[in-house]
C-alpha cells in the first residue's frame, strides 16, 4: 500500500506522510522571525524580490487578524489566504458574541484546530503553512505562538519558521536575553539581526511589523528598516575595532 497517498492512514512506522510533506513545503517558504519583547511584539519576514512590473504591496507575508493580533507565515501563500480569512471571521464572531477581542491563544488554538481537521479528513490535504501569531491580550500581556501543518501549537519567547529557520533559531538561542529585549529598539534590532543571518541583500529584502501595547499594528517603511540596519552595521564595526585593540 502507498502510505504517502492516503492522508488518513498511518504508515507502519507511525508516519503521516502528507503532513510531513506539508512541513517540507514550509521549509521552502520565506524565513519569518517573531520576538516577544517587554512592551512590544515584532515580526520580521524575508521579502523575495518581485518582478519589475509587479506591485510589491500585493505580496505580503504579514497580516492583521484583529486589532490586537497579527501573524506571519511561511509556506504556500494560497493556503495561508484561506486560513487568514477564516481566522478573521472567527475574530469578528468572537467580538460580536462576547463583546471582547480574542486572546492570542484563543485564535492560535482555532487556527491549530482548523489545520488538524485537515489532517484527519478524506478528500482534503493539510495546509502547507506554518504561522507565527503575535499580539497582546486585553490585560496587556505580549504573546507569541507558532503553529505547524500538523495542528500543534506552542508559546515562544522568540522563534523562526521557513527556509532559514534552523540557523535563525540558533542565532536567537545565543542572543535572546533580557538585556537584548530591554527596549523596543533593541527588540526590533534583534529581529533584524536574526534575519540578516539568512537575508543576503540587507534591509531592502526585509519586511517588519511591530505592535506596542495599546497601539495599532505598524508596518515599518524601508527607510526605517535601513536606518536600523545602518545602526547594526555601525555597532558591528565598533565591536570589531575593540577586538582588534585587545589583541594588539
From Swiss-Prot:
It is found in: Cytoplasm; Nucleus. Phosphorylated in G2 phase. Keywords: Cytoplasm, Nucleus, Phosphoprotein, Proteasome. GO terms for biological process: proteasome-mediated ubiquitin-dependent protein catabolic process. Its main location: cytoplasm. It comes from the Eukaryota. InterPro entries: Ntn_hydrolases_N, Proteasome_alpha, Proteasome_alpha-type, Proteasome_asu_N, Proteasome_sua/b. GO terms for cellular component: cytoplasm; nucleus; proteasome core complex; proteasome core complex, alpha-subunit complex. Disulfide bonds: none annotated. It holds the Pfam family Proteasome. Belongs to the peptidase T1A family. PANTHER family: PROTEASOME SUBUNIT ALPHA/BETA. The 26S proteasome consists of a 20S proteasome core and two 19S regulatory subunits. The 20S proteasome core is composed of 28 subunits that are arranged in four stacked rings, resulting in a barrel-shaped structure. The two end rings are each formed by seven alpha subunits, and the two central rings are each formed by seven beta subunits. The catalytic chamber with the active sites is on the inside of the barrel. The proteasome is a multicatalytic proteinase complex which is characterized by its ability to cleave peptides with Arg, Phe, Tyr, Leu, and Glu adjacent to the leaving group at neutral or slightly basic pH. The proteasome has an ATP-dependent proteolytic activity. This is Proteasome subunit alpha type-7-A. It comes from Xenopus laevis. The lineage of its organism: Eukaryota, Metazoa, Chordata, Craniata, Vertebrata. The gene is psma7-a.
Amino acid at each position: 500500500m502507498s502510505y504517502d497517498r492516503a492522508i488518513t492512514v498511518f504508515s507502519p512506522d507511525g508516519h503521516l506522510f502528507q503532513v510531513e510533506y506539508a512541513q517540507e513545503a514550509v521549509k521552502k517558504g520565506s524565513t519569518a522571525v517573531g520576538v516577544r519583547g517587554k512592551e512590544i511584539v515584532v515580526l520580521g519576514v524575508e521579502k523575495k524580490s518581485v518582478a519589475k512590473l509587479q506591485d510589491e504591496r500585493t505580496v505580503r507575508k504579514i497580516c492583521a487578524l484583529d486589532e490586537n493580533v497579527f501573524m506571519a507565515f511561511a509556506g504556500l501563500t494560497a493556503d495561508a489566504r484561506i486560513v487568514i480569512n477564516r481566522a478573521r471571521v472567527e475574530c469578528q464572531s468572537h467580538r460580536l458574541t462576547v463583546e471582547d477581542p480574542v486572546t492570542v491563544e484563543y485564535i492560535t488554538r482555532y487556527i491549530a484546530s482548523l489545520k488538524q481537521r485537515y489532517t484527519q479528513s478524506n478528500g482534503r490535504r493539510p495546509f502547507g503553512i506554518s504561522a507565527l501569531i503575535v499580539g497582546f491580550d486585553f490585560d496587556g500581556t505580549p504573546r507569541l505562538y507558532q503553529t505547524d501543518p500538523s495542528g500543534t501549537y506552542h508559546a515562544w519567547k522568540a522563534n523562526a519558521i521557513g527556509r532559514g529557520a534552523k540557523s535563525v533559531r540558533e542565532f536567537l538561542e545565543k542572543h535572546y536575553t533580557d538585556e537584548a529585549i530591554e527596549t523596543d529598539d533593541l527588540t526590533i534590532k534583534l529581529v533584524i539581526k536574526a534575519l540578516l543571518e539568512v537575508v543576503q541583500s540587507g534591509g531592502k529584502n526585509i519586511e517588519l511589523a511591530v505592535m506596542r501595547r495599546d497601539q495599532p499594528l505598524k508596518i515599518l517603511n524601508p527607510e526605517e528598516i535601513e536606518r536600523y540596519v545602518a545602526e547594526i552595521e555601525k555597532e558591528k564595526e565598533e565591536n570589531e575595532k575593540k577586538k582588534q585593540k585587545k589583541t594588539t
